[in-house]
């Protein structure tokens, strides 16, 4: 398929620059997966569309303050490093800016030497594998020196760093938030549980793919970047019993969706599993895991627009996006949401 099929016009003014005061007061577009039917609600109304016995699957990853500003040890030249994925031990895949002059063997220093990063492998498009040297616990060094890695389309400074975390964020390791989850409050989750809906958690650490646009004209030629995921036995058992009882599995976000569908590609039942996934979901994909999807509005021509188009249809999704634009919904990470069901 041609990538232009997943384009739509978005006025820049509709890109949300800051979160709303109250998470669950964002707008919610309801889209009938099979019919294309559209309804306009608010996120706190999501309870009207969840049934007793359904299971809501959330990604409990936590965003690291993974943007570091430092200098090249040899020259003192300024450099920015965005930590993306832990490869093994202290070796991390990162994005550097500028990257051109950072070669294997070069060292970068951050916080007057509190973190030193040595380049051990050069990748394309500004990517590098860096070996980190530091005293103590890395998370503590990042909390001290790092900044939250907001997407490039957000120009405003974030006053409260926790607003780029879900209220249930737990497992540190992401370079970006699973943004569909940003709309939930503790109170809303309690209301959902009170009506007999199950809450389940998986983990997928959001990595490089979030920051890289599709660079091919034919989407069949696109290759996804790998991201680490895990699901425990308790969650697998809950999802299997949900399915056995004839109830629905509602995925919160494309990251939860990619995790669940990865696991179900090699099995007819949910199983406890961890590993790396590069699953690319686009129209024609056979969904085996989910019955509904809560997701934000995504960038034109992105793999995430392709994923939601696969779950519903390209025509229904583009029509819904165009209606959202006409209704002045807020787009992207701090924007509004849609429920496809």
From Swiss-Prot:
Specify the enzyme's EC class, one word.
transferase
Chief subcellular location = cytoplasm
**Which InterPro entries does the record match to this protein?**
QueA, QueA_dom1, QueA_dom2, QueA_sf
Q: Which reaction does it catalyse?
A: 7-aminomethyl-7-carbaguanosine(34) in tRNA + S-adenosyl-L-methionine = epoxyqueuosine(34) in tRNA + adenine + L-methionine + 2 H(+)
What is its biological role?
Transfers and isomerizes the ribose moiety from AdoMet to the 7-aminomethyl group of 7-deazaguanine (preQ1-tRNA) to give epoxyqueuosine (oQ-tRNA).
Against PANTHER family, the record matches this protein to: S-ADENOSYLMETHIONINE:TRNA RIBOSYLTRANSFERASE-ISOMERASE (PTHR30307:SF0)
Name the UniProt record assigns to this protein: S-adenosylmethionine:tRNA ribosyltransferase-isomerase
Natural source organism = Staphylococcus saprophyticus subsp. saprophyticus (strain ATCC 15305 / DSM 20229 / NCIMB 8711 / NCTC 7292 / S-41)
Name of encoding gene: queA
């Amino acid at each position: 398929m041609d990538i232009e099929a997943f384009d739509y016009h978005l006025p820049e003014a509709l890109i949300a620059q800051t979160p709303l005061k109250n998470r669950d007061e964002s707008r919610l577009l309801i889209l009938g997966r099979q019919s294309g039917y559209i309804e306009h609600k608010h996120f706190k109304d999501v309870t009207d569309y969840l049934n007793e016995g359904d299971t809501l699957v959330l990604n409990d990853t936590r965003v690291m303050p993974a943007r570091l500003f430092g200098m090249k040890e040899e020259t003192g030249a300024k450099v920015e490093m965005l930590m993306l994925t832990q490869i093994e031990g202290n070796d991390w895949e990162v994005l550097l800016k500028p990257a051109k002059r950072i070669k294997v063997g070069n060292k970068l220093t951050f916080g007057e030497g509190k973190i030193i990063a040595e380049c051990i492998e050069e990748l394309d498009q500004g990517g590098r594998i860096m070996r980190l040297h530091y005293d103590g616990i890395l998370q503590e060094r990042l909390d001290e020196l790092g900044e939250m890695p907001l997407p490039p389309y957000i120009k405003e400074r974030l006053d409260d760093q926790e607003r780029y975390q879900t209220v249930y964020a737990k497992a540190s390791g992401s370079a970006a938030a699973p943004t569909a989850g940003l709309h939930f409050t503790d109170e809303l989750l309690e209301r959902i549980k009170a009506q007999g809906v199950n809450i389940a958690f998986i983990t997928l650490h959001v990595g490089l793919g979030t920051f890289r646009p599709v660079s091919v004209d034919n989407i069949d030629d696109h290759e996804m970047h790998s991201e680490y995921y895990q699901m425990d036995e308790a969650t697998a058992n809950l999802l299997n019993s949900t399915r056995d009882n004839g109830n629905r599995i509602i995925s919160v976000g494309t990251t939860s969706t990619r995790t669940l569908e990865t696991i179900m590609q090699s099995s007819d039942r949910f199983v406890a599993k961890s590993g790396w996934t590069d699953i690319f979901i686009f129209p024609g994909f056979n969904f085996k895991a989910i019955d509904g999807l809560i997701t934000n509005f995504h960038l034109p021509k992105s793999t995430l627009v392709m994923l939601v188009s696969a779950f519903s249809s390209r025509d229904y999704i583009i029509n819904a996006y165009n209606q959202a634009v006409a209704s002045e919904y807020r787009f992207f990470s701090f924007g509004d949401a849609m429920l496809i069901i």
